[in-house]
Amino acid sequence: MIRENIKGVTAFALAITSNPHVAEEAVQETFIRAWRYWPTFRNESSAISWLVTICRRVVIDMAKKQKVHEQLPENVIEIRDHFASTAIYDMVRELPLPQREVVVLCAILGFDYESASQALEIPIGTVRSRLARAREQLGKQLDDVMAI
């Protein structure tokens, strides 16, 4: 389970935290909790959806304790591999956190709307609207870049 899902969970953690060290800590805690609660896992969703849900809760818990900032650091290289260019990466980084979460899950990790909905514990309609707003904002930013 760890081998198949560590990259996805790490990409998600990096996308929603401001610090690669915090993301690493969140990923470790995610897999510790997953191991602890494995007997309660129901196959109603995929393992990655379940792990992303755990990771999101871990990051929220850590943010309450450590007041994690929303912006991504400049030196995060791992998640850049998922984007076609640094410009697009920077545009995604500027999205509000709720939109960024949906973009990471759907566009990068390949979640369908239902899986993203389960992972983020929000309605499917909210996933769709956040993704639509993110696409609209990214489109505007891309138009601005292309106009230069």
Protein language model features and the residues they cover:
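Arg/Lys-rich amphipathic alpha helix in sigma70-family domain 2
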Residues: 40-43, 52-73, 133
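Internal acidic/polar
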Residues: 61, 66-92, 112, 147
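A short pre-motif secondary-structure segment
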Residues: 102-106
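Residues within helix-turn-helix
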Residues: 21, 114, 125
